[in-house]
């Protein structure tokens, strides 16, 4: 699917919802709006700021304009310079700061108050704490007994599409992108005339947990929005895993369709919501997902 197709899907879905699709310029990668490149080192510089990310560490460059253009074109760690065989101090400090940020978002918990404020039902997997979640991924693929009963009692049965939110490996991905992806996603699915299940939050969930959820609720399509494993300095990336008629015993990873890198510096959440709506409609039409879908 190329960019023109994505933009057409966004326009179509947003139009059916009575909203105006954002102009392509509004959905540009964050790198195009980064701060002006900085060449001097400073102990007072915030290592997580746009100014620090735009820093150029190459001393006395032959073509400074080329470095400036390269620096503005990507968020990758380029133009950092060297001090002999070693990285420069500021480049090393920023690397360590980004690494710390990524570790923090893996270890943080989604606050219970935040879940309640969104009006979401909260259930959990068989995991009881973050340490167990990181060391026993198999237990994160199954709901606890209380969660199974809660879903049967409080969720819509046999929906066309069931939307599930889970913390995964990034708390920030959920809390930062939630407001921009779930409301337009739910509105788009309903506008398409689909029976939509009760959205809920799964704490300590892994991707395969959507198979059990789909089986319990009898959902035709299950959409899981889950926090991605964070990269260096990028802790807000969300993934969507969609699967048709999942079953615990027979569904394999090739049966899932994944849309990744959903955040303001990647695929904007509102745009992703429109693409997911179109994906769900095609899954229901073809009665397939993953590699079984007709491209």
Curated annotation (Swiss-Prot):
This is Ethanolamine ammonia-lyase small subunit. The lineage of its organism: Bacteria, Pseudomonadati, Pseudomonadota, Gammaproteobacteria, Enterobacterales. It is found in: Bacterial microcompartment. Transmembrane segments: none annotated. The basic unit is a heterodimer which dimerizes to form tetramers. The heterotetramers trimerize; 6 large subunits form a core ring with 6 small subunits projecting outwards. GO terms for cellular component: ethanolamine ammonia-lyase complex; ethanolamine degradation polyhedral organelle. It comes from Escherichia coli (strain 55989 / EAEC). Its cofactor is adenosylcob(III)alamin. Adenosylcob(III)alamin binds at residues 207, 228, 258. Coiled coil: none annotated.
């Amino acid at each position: 699917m190329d960019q023109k197709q994505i933009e057409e899907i966004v326009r179509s879905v947003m139009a059916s919802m009575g909203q105006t699709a954002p102009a392509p310029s509004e959905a540009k990668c964050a790198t195009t709006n980064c701060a002006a490149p900085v060449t001097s080192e400073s102990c007072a510089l915030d290592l997580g700021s746009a100014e620090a990310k735009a820093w150029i560490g190459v001393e006395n460059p032959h073509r400074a304009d080329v470095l400036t253009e390269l620096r503005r074109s990507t968020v990758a760690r380029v133009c950092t310079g060297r001090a002999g065989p070693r990285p420069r101090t500021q480049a090393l400090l920023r690397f360590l700061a980004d690494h710390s940020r990524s570790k923090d978002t893996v270890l943080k918990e989604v606050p219970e108050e935040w879940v309640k404020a969104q009006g979401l039902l909260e259930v959990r997997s068989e995991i009881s704490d973050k340490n167990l979640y990181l060391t026993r991924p198999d237990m994160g693929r199954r709901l606890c007994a209380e969660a199974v009963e809660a879903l049967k009692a409080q969720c819509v049965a046999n929906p066309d599409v069931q939307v599930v939110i889970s913390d995964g490996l990034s708390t920030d991905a959920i809390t930062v992108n939630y407001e921009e992806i779930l409301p337009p996603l739910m509105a788009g699915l309903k506008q398409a005339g689909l029976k939509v299940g009760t959205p809920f939050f799964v704490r300590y969930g892994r991707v395969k947990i959507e198979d059990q959820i789909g089986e319990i609720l009898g959902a035709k399509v299950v959409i899981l929005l889950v926090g991605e494993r964070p990269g260096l300095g990028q802790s807000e990336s969300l993934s969507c895993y969609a699967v048709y008629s999942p079953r615990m015993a027979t569904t394999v990873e090739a049966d899932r369709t994944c849309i990744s890198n959903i955040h303001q510096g990647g695929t904007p959440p509102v745009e992703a919501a429109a693409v997911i709506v179109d994906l769900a409609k095609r899954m229901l039409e073809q009665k397939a997902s993953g590699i079984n879908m007709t491209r």
